[in-house]
Amino acid sequence: MLQVQAVHRDEKQAVKLKKTTYLPYLFNLVLPKMFYPNRIVVARLYTDVHEHDKQAAEYFEGFQTPCFEVPASLFPGEAPLDKIVFMPTVMLPMGFEAGGVFGPGVLPRRSYPIDLMASGHKGQTPPLFVGLRSLYVQLPSGIESFLDTVVDNAAGQDALVYGSCQPGNHPSKGEQSKELMHSNDCSLSIAYNLPAPPTPPSPYPFPPLPVQYNIYTPDLSNVHMLMLQQRNPTVALLSTVNHPHVPAVAFATMGDEECPKFELPSDIFPICEGVNRPIFLPRRFLPKGFDAGCVFKPASLPKLWFVKHIGGFNRPQPQHNNAITPPLFVGKISLVVGAHHLAKELQRQGEQKAQSEGAEGGSLKVVEPNGGFIPVTQGFMVMETEQQTPPRGAYSLESYQEASEKGCVVRAIKDEAIEATDTLLSKLASKPEDMQKKYLSCFKVDSDIDLMAEAMADMGTAEMSLLAKRETLPGVDGPRALDQLRQVVEDRSQIRSHTDQLIQDHIYRMDRNRMLALRQPFAPWFGCGTIERK
């Protein structure tokens, strides 16, 4: 979906609907409210979802349909704007006073709006909807009440709720029989989190950084899966709010720790390779009662898959980003316990804990944060520099003890072994104390890798070592991790130097061509005696 500048339209502006080969029924298409300030909206359509309504096209042929002037600046190239088919009002999405569609293959690839079509898309261009919103939007009462309920539930969590099925649209018995998730091969479960104690306010006034989805490995050891029927495998929607990414779990999956694996049913799950492949978790990070399990990161599975298999049969989970599909857990059960017995067990554990606390103090105690959770690493690399000002993307530290408290695991210092001769040592001894002082700078774990490589390149010959002890990094191969980090930094430095060389070569060629153009000789033209450049 794309948003552009506002467009003004006359109320009586209309056009006659001609015979067309693509006219979908888009009344049930709901677009986010975040695009209401700018009235014109562009959205990509899918032919398998938004099919051509042949009966409606024949019925409305010759009718007057509302239209507006489509801005040419919306398309990167010269697009055939006259081929848009404006739709009747009853077929437009809710909240739109006019709109039209470009059929499949009507827009050329060079004229299709940027970011609405994948770079590797093959075949004809997908259909495109261009609509003009109404100034006053009136939604049905059912949808209004549903949106109000969702907003009230998510107001205290500062997150969005993912919902892929419209309220009130329950599938029929024929559609339920087609649901693969309700077959005898696998079951659908709900991820239930034990109530966590309140956390103290953060001492940092800065806003939280945006969530990354390049890798997603949550800690599910404190999560219980509740299900009516237990079958292998079982699937459950996860929440990026309740089940955040934990770097320690990612380190464990990349280390030597065993991650039990199993084969996913090919008739249910699509083939995901590369960065979208499922990540199998170590046994100690799995939910209780599971032998093996894997996690699909957010946006790795297509939305149509969720709508077809899970959309109408699972409660929504709070997500940080509602524009992409949520993460999914697929596990293999080892402990067969009914949902009722599991709930009773949870209740019994809570009562025992309350009785033990009451017997010790005789009164209610202030709930303190539980230190058993794996902390999220704040720092990553501490660097020794001779400049007091820290490099770009880093901040200053006072000592290595503070770096350890921040969670730094890698140390980078300047390798002065080659320069450490007697002459140089005498020169260093003669320098003032301020010149010999070293300053510490810290890069966070989510800092830009290019800024790290640039800072290490400014140091010259740098040496990296592990600052953290082996006990604090269980299951991590330290030398191997350092080699991988060193290789990444060297690759970024080579890319940067190669780019600089290409720019210098381009500047040299431009200067050379300009000088050659200025050195062309002048000669008089015998026709009129004027000077002509040869």
From Swiss-Prot:
Q: Which UniProt keywords apply?
A: Repeat
Q: Please name the InterPro entries in this protein's record.
A: DM7 (IPR006610)
Q: Does the keyword Repeat apply?
A: yes
- Protein family according to the UniProt entry: Belongs to the DM7 family.
Specify the protein name: DM7 family protein GE17491
**Source species of the chain:** Drosophila yakuba
